[in-house]
């Protein structure tokens, strides 16, 4: 369609004269317009052919850009740079993320210790150089899959390993810190509470038993902790240093606000050593001059006393209180017995025992003769007066005499004797019919006019 330049009437392209006003159209314009339309159509065809090529070229450019972007973040060199930057910038959270594994969660505090350990024991410049060289060699190698970065002293501090690929093209490098188990060995059952792997942790260790408290990456640690024993609760730290271990474990040094008590006794020479006890905060324990008692919290007073026996009687010291302000890591205390009181009692009891022993010597001398006569004559009456009638021992000896199985005895010696009311226990050493010495324990009863009779016996 075209418009008449004179009246504006619309007309077909091939019309020569306007039907409205009779204006004669210029045929050259129609030819020009036709030629132009054909050119436009030709150009459109060319453009349509070029579009797929342009799209393909654009996609290729995008792929190349994407490859370089992926390489910048996923190549072994890029992975190495991420770890190096985190260590250089003390980014403990990033280091913790990079070193954490499914089996061992590393928290930011461990990572902080690890960063400092690398800088102290390897040196940052040397570490970066060693790491880059190790990654380069592993990346080029067709056989090696792992290698270690070491400290100046030769301890492994970082394991670098190949772990598959990233996006087909790039080796995936895995960075893992080797671990060790810190171990405790408390003197008594102890509960430890501290933070590890970003979580609160509790470890219960039995007395004198080696107990691991977890797995830790290399470092010099001073971990805030609480510990609890029968003696109380303690605040302090668990300390351990990887430099001090060449094995899979590292010893823990406990650093708590605690007091250990050394006890010295005076006036105790007459007391039986096995009977001596120390009571600290109402807890009684055997005494030893070489033993250290505790630990006890330094923020609470301690009460302490001692006891011991002499000739069956218990003697005690006065109870002393050690103020919390006077408690030190090693605290010494002296407890005094009333030595005069003990000596007077021992002297009195020894006189009584000597008198009792003399009576028993006389009694058992007669008893052994009567026992042997009853055996030789097969007559229980010889020995019956030495044994209390109605006792199980009375019936037993009578039966043995009738069966001829009574044992002959001789040379009785009184080893020990104690009297409690009308009952006497005596340890007697005898020679049996085979000529062998045997120790027997007898129980006797003292009746009217101090008459002694046996009621029980047993071999010691």
From Swiss-Prot:
Name of the protein in its database record: Membrane-associated protein TcaA
GO BP, sorted A to Z: response to antibiotic
Organism name: Staphylococcus aureus (strain MRSA252)
Family listed: Belongs to the TcaA family.
Zinc listed as a keyword: yes
UniProt membrane topology term: Single-pass membrane protein
GO MF term set: zinc ion binding
Chain spans, region Disordered: 439-460
Lineage of the organism: Bacteria, Bacillati, Bacillota, Bacilli, Bacillales
Residue ranges covered by zinc fingers (C4-type): 4-21
Cytoplasmic side: 1-49
Gene field: tcaA
Compartment annotation: Cell membrane
Function (record text): Plays a major role in decreasing resistance to glycopeptide antibiotics.
Alphabetic keyword roster: Antibiotic resistance, Cell membrane, Membrane, Metal-binding, Transmembrane, Transmembrane helix, Zinc, Zinc-finger
Topological domain spans for side Extracellular: 71-460
Superkingdom field: Bacteria
Chief place where the protein resides: membrane
GO cellular component, one term: plasma membrane
TM regions (residue ranges): 50-70
């Amino acid at each position: 369609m075209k418009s008449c330049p004179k009246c504006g009437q619309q007309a077909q392209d091939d019309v020569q004269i306007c039907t409205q006003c009779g204006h004669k159209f210029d045929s050259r314009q129609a030819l020009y317009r036709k030629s132009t339309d054909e050119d436009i159509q030709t150009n459109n065809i060319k453009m349509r052919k070029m579009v797929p090529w342009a799209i393909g070229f654009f996609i290729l450019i995008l792929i190349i850009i994407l490859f370089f972007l992926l390489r910048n973040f996923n190549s072994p060199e890029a992975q190495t740079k991420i770890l190096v930057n985190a260590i250089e910038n003390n980014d403990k959270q990033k280091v913790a993320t990079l070193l954490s594994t499914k089996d061992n969660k590393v928290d930011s505090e461990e990572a902080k210790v690890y960063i400092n350990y690398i800088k102290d024991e390897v040196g940052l410049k040397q570490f970066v150089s060693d790491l880059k060289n190790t990654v380069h060699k592993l990346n080029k190698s067709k056989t090696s899959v792992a290698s270690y970065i070491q400290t100046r002293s030769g301890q492994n501090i970082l394991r670098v390993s190949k772990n598959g690929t990233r996006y087909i093209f790039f080796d995936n490098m895995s960075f893992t810190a080797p671990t060790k188990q810190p171990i405790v060995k408390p003197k008594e059952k102890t509960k430890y509470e501290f933070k590890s792997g970003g979580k609160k942790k509790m470890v219960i260790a039995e007395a004198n038993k080696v107990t691991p408290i977890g797995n830790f990456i290399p470092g010099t640690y001073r971990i805030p902790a609480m510990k609890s024993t029968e003696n109380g609760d303690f605040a302090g730290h668990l300390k351990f240093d990887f430099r001090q271990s060449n094995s899979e474990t590292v010893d823990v040094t406990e650093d708590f606000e605690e007091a250990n008590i050394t006890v010295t006794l005076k006036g105790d020479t007459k007391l039986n050593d096995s009977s001596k006890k120390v009571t600290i905060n109402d807890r009684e324990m055997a005494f030893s001059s070489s033993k250290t008692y505790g630990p006890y919290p330094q923020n609470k007073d301690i009460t302490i006393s001692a006891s011991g026996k002499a000739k069956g009687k218990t003697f005690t010291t006065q109870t002393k209180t050690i103020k919390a302000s006077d408690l030190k890591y090693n605290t010494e205390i002296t407890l005094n017995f009333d030595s005069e009181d003990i000596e007077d009692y021992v002297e009195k009891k020894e006189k009584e025992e000597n008198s009792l022993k003399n009576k028993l010597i006389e009694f058992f001398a007669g008893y052994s003769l009567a026992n042997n006569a009853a055996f030789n004559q097969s007559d229980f009456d010889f020995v019956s007066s030495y044994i209390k009638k109605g006792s199980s021992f009375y019936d037993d000896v009578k039966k043995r005499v009738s069966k001829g199985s009574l044992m002959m005895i001789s040379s009785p010696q009184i080893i020990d004797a104690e009297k409690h009311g009308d009952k006497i226990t005596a340890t007697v050493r005898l020679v049996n019919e085979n000529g062998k010495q045997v120790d027997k324990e007898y129980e006797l009863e003292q009746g009217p006019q101090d008459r002694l009779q046996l009621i029980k016996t047993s071999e010691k």
